[in-house]
A protein has these predicted regions:
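Conserved pre-motif C helix in the palm subdomain of viral-like polymerases
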Residues: 79-111, 185-213
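Active-site-proximal segment of RNA-dependent polymerases
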Residues: 1-9, 95, 99-156
Length: 292
């Protein structure tokens, strides 16, 4: 088992890290050559990095407090979702500052089967891996697909912190993460920069259950959407039960009752696949276009 990592807070709490976090946080934010209002106000008031120095002092003295947020109801992928928005300064910059430091530590401990919140590993790469798996026609006669009910809103914040504490031993950092994860009354929220990677890393436990303990050969996960291929239907039923038990007992979440277990009827396109179109029918990531 890898050793826990220390001295994380000291890497986060530097002026240089906050400056770089600001630069990363504003990437691709210009509309018609103009930054949004929050960034413009920050730039106007951040003379000689005075605001970043103030944030640095708050972090160092542990006096930082979570700021108000807004919630916008929006329909995406045929579902209504609550999108949470925080102020650019200090919250969004701080989220980037934290992720800049912990990202390599978390991603290095993930398995190759995970495809969310990781640079260079999105839906296209997940579909490519599925296509590669499907070349073994005898070993991929059946597929199991399932996901978690209301994934982000039902994440247990204390469980998320507990899992992070198995990677990091820096108490000051863990106290900061405790505050950031508990920004809202419950769940990890869509729109918070720290949410996706944190949630994705949590489910590394599921990845290791499926591939190491149960020995599944063909498996792909995009956040909470999981696809397992096999030539044994009974094995997939066992996998479903084990996943369900782990998700309920450890994460205190629930697998959708309408999971799919079916014989494969046709493959993904051999040479190309189109990017999912907004508003299209079917599963969110089109990883299961496998059954008739």
């Amino acid at each position: 088992m890898p050793q826990r990592i220390g001295y994380i807070f000291d890497q986060i709490c530097t002026l240089d890290n906050l400056i770089q976090a600001d630069l990363e946080a504003r990437k691709n934010k210009k509309h018609f050559g103009v930054y949004p209002y929050g960034i413009r106000i920050f730039d106007k008031n951040n003379v000689d990095n005075c605001l970043l120095k103030q944030l640095l002092w708050q972090l160092d003295t542990e006096t930082y407090e979570n700021q108000p947020y807004t919630v916008e109801r929006r329909k995406t992928d045929r579902k209504w979702r609550d999108l949470y928005k925080v102020n650019y300064y200090p919250t969004h910059i701080l989220h980037h500052a934290v992720m800049r430091v912990i990202y390599p530590y978390l991603t290095s401990r993930m398995t190759r089967h995970s495809f969310a919140g990781i640079e260079g590993k999105g839906t296209t790469q997940a579909a490519d891996l599925l296509k590669f798996y499907l070349k073994d026609k005898e070993g991929t006669k059946y597929f199991l697909q399932e996901d978690v009910c209301k994934f982000y809103p039902t994440i247990d914040q204390d469980v998320a912190l507990s899992i992070l504490s198995k990677v990091f031993k820096d108490r000051k950092f863990l106290r900061l993460m405790d505050k950031l994860l508990h920004h809202t009354p419950s769940g990890l929220q869509i729109g918070f920069y720290i949410s996706q990677l944190t949630a994705n890393y949590m489910y590394t436990l599921v990845d290791r259950l499926i591939t190491e303990k149960l020995g599944a050969k063909y498996y792909v996960r995009f956040c909470d959407d999981m696809v397992i291929l096999s030539n044994d239907r009974c094995f997939l039923l066992k996998v479903h039960k084990e996943i369900k038990d782990l998700v309920e007992k450890v994460f205190h979440q629930k697998i959708h009752d309408d999971y799919i277990l079916s014989r494969i009827g046709y493959e993904l396109r051999n040479d190309t696949h189109r990017k999912r179109q907004r508003g299209s029918k079917g599963k969110k990531y089109r990883l299961s276009r496998l059954s008739v």
